[in-house]
């Protein structure tokens, strides 16, 4: 997807948020809550820091009608499910942890 797309709603976002290919060190997700705002950028998945958007942010980002925000390669969404379980400490479970703890809502238009 390119930023110069005229009608963003006509495009399909090209990643599946439930199956990110994230590997490596992660943020600690155990304190995340339902409806927390997060963002997905490349292979990073982090909670959004509270901040007041500047006027320059408005000129470099586009907003989908469903509320998802496209800014460069960043997609913003909200946590829609939080499933707590004990961390097993293996690399494979890092990916499973991300898939089970965090879901993005209304990112892919259908």
Swiss-Prot record:
Residues 45-69 are annotated as: Disordered. GO terms for biological process: mismatch repair; RNA catabolic process. Its main location: cytoplasm. Residues 51-66 have a biased composition (Low complexity). The keyword Nucleus applies. It is found in: Cytoplasm; Nucleus. Belongs to the RNase H2 subunit C family. Highly divergent. Non catalytic subunit of RNase H2, an endonuclease that specifically degrades the RNA of RNA:DNA hybrids. Participates in DNA replication, possibly by mediating the removal of lagging-strand Okazaki fragment RNA primers during DNA replication. Mediates the excision of single ribonucleotides from DNA:RNA duplexes. Present with 556 molecules/cell in log phase SD medium. The RNase 2 complex is a heterotrimer composed of the catalytic subunit RNH201 and of the non-catalytic subunits RNH202 and RNH203. This is Ribonuclease H2 subunit C. It comes from Saccharomyces cerevisiae (strain ATCC 204508 / S288c). The lineage of its organism: Eukaryota, Fungi, Dikarya, Ascomycota, Saccharomycotina. The gene is RNH203.
């Amino acid at each position: 997807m390119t930023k110069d797309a005229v009608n963003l709603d006509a495009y399909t976002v090209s990643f599946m948020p439930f199956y990110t290919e994230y590997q490596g060190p992660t943020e600690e997700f155990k304190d995340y809550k339902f409806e927390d705002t997060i963002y997905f950028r490349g292979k990073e998945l982090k909670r959004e820091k509270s901040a007041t958007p500047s006027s320059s942010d408005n000129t470099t980002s586009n907003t989908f009608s469903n509320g998802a925000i496209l800014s460069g390669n960043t997609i913003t969404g909200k946590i829609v499910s939080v499933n707590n379980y004990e961390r097993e400490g293996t690399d494979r479970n890092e990916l499973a942890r991300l898939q089970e703890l965090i879901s993005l809502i209304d990112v892919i238009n259908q």
